[in-house]
Amino acid sequence: LLIRIKNLCNKNIVIVPGGGSFADSIRDVYDKTKMSENLANKLALKSTELFAEYLKELDNDLCLIENPKNFTKEEICVWLPSKKLSQNNSFKNNWDSTSDSVAAWLANKIMAEGIIFIKSLKDFKSKNKLYYLQNKNILDKNISIYLSGYNGLIKIVGLNILKKLEKESSWKGFI
């Protein structure tokens, strides 16, 4: 997927990865121990950075970056959010904020042209209401806070993205 994105897109791309199984492990430890919710959420946010390191291992051309002001057009950047968000009171660091909220928060801050959420979906309606996506746990419960006032394009794609990207020579009509 990273290779296809690099070949098809001539825009700034910032990846905000989820924490995946790393975050799931933190939640499991939190549920089974006396770990504070504050620490658990902090570690879950850091787990996105572990996944970022894994992406970097898969594609050494990716740049890992902490400061959103340092994104470049020449590279696909993967944002490491824990330092910035731990210093920012406008982000709700709790279990209702996942990487969905992190991506929406960042998109709003940098006035991104669009956000693409890549989800493990097979079948998906082309238009959905936000509350429906939240109730189905497709998007997190806090995302509406960060999408408020956001004017960019929002797309949610599932497993079908790989098949579509194989056939496309550009992003037009796709995003």
PLM regions and their residue ranges:
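Nucleotide/pyrophosphate-binding catalytic subdomain
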Residues: 1-174
